[in-house]
Amino acid sequence: MPRPLPSQIAASLATALMGMMCVASVAACSKSKEPAKEPPKEAMKEPAKEPAPAKEPAKDQVEVFSWWTGAGEEEGLNAMIADFKSKNPTIDVVNAAVAGGAGTNAKAVLNTRLQAGNPPDSYQRHAGLELADDIKADKVEDLTKLYETQGWKDKLPKGLLDAITIDGKIYSVPVNIHRANLIWFTPKTLKALGIAGPPKTWKEFLTQAKTIKGKGKTALAIGPAWTQKHLLETVLLGELGPEKYTGLWNGTTDWKGAEVAAALKTFNQVLEASDIKTAAADWQPAADRVLDGAAVYTVMGDWQDGYLKGAKKLKFQTDYDVTASPGSAGVYDFLSDSFTLPKGAKHRDAAEKWLIECGSTQGQDLFNPQKGSVPARTDADKSKYTGYLAVALKDWQDPATKIVGSLAHGVVANNAFSSELETALGIFVESRDAAGFAAAVAKAYAATR
């Protein structure tokens, strides 16, 4: 019942008092004034209520799992998330990124979640055989129909499409193309040392390393285990050439053969010219050693460009420069980051919309310039790719460029083989037993095919 207004209370009290007086004396009542009239009914109505505020639309969400937490890559991811939110305002993005170069830590966390049946709504994997185990274990959905409805098949290079197609089906959406076979340096350091230019072969690098050591500097800055694996693939590529390098992953090149033995000898010598005993914690600190002049070179993929021009605010070909790693001119050792749709995703529809963002021209053109990569799509806006990225895009789309896949970044090796190789590499780095390493890798290859 509504609470009476003050005027109503006064009227009620007056009426009650009059009644009591009339019982005591009728004569007195007849001479008294008339009781106060009740206020009009309109005055007794309940005050009008303000209209209830309109309800906000119910929020959905999508959990996006990646390892993009470093400078450049984090900004790129955030740019793509912002674009996604502008197109899907009722979907919150849960950024579940886990720190660690090349996804070393993130992959361990992800595998635990997949084993427990608790997948994120979409997760990052490298395109290629890295995803093969998840496909075999029935952890991810077939996205072929999504490719057809979005018209993506006509927008991706054939080589990339082949790399992400397994038994005629496609299971991930690539957002970019990276190049692994690069060596980075600063022009001012080379000039100060009297070195005309970066080495074109690993033999030339070793010759330069002697001069560099004599000047009190380290020839090559190196990072943790995964960066050493990355270095191994570039030495193997430079020493064996693209065809025999590819043969290591399809069985046509013998790991225990003389050519591989010679390449591993070179790799051993390259390690001797590096700061392996005081290896940096990750690739960014290794790059910093080159910037401050403690080391002359570092071998790393082109995500380093995003770090140097973004976080470090440096200018390409003035403050830093890059070229194909020794022996690999004209070759593009590629890798690609891609996203999946796990089976059992809690927010499947939102996850599918995230994949559409990943595969869109706008999403890729926002992400890649900051990440330090080129778009997976062939119809991206080339004007957005300047400096090093303009060179990378030109090389990637050049029909004369020879394309090979990365070992360290999941294109050519499944997870089991890659893990066994990495274990053997860790032993080799300590023992320097090249023959033992080759035998262990050959055995692992045969066992994990």
Label each residue range with its predicted role.
Residues R113, P120-D121, W152-K188, A219, ...:
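A structural signal for short loop-to-beta-strand junctions that line the ligand-binding cleft
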Residues W67, K265-H347, K353:
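Extracytoplasmic/periplasmic substrate-binding proteins
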Residues L131-D138, L160-G197, P224-L248, D333-L341, ...:
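Periplasmic solute-binding protein
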Residues A82-G159, A163-T165, K191-G194, K200, ...:
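Extracytoplasmic "Venus flytrap"/periplasmic binding protein-like
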Residues S373-A376, A380, V391-R449:
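C-terminal capping/gating helix-and-loop segments adjacent to ligand/active sites or protein-protein/ligand interfaces
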Residues T144-L156, E239-A262, G310-F316, Y320-Y332, ...:
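Short, solvent-exposed loop/beta-turn-alpha elements that line the ligand-binding surface or hinge
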Residues V26-E38:
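Bacterial lipoprotein signal-peptidase II cleavage site
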Residues A209-K210, N250-A280:
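Glycine-centered hinge/linker elements that transmit conformational signals in sensory
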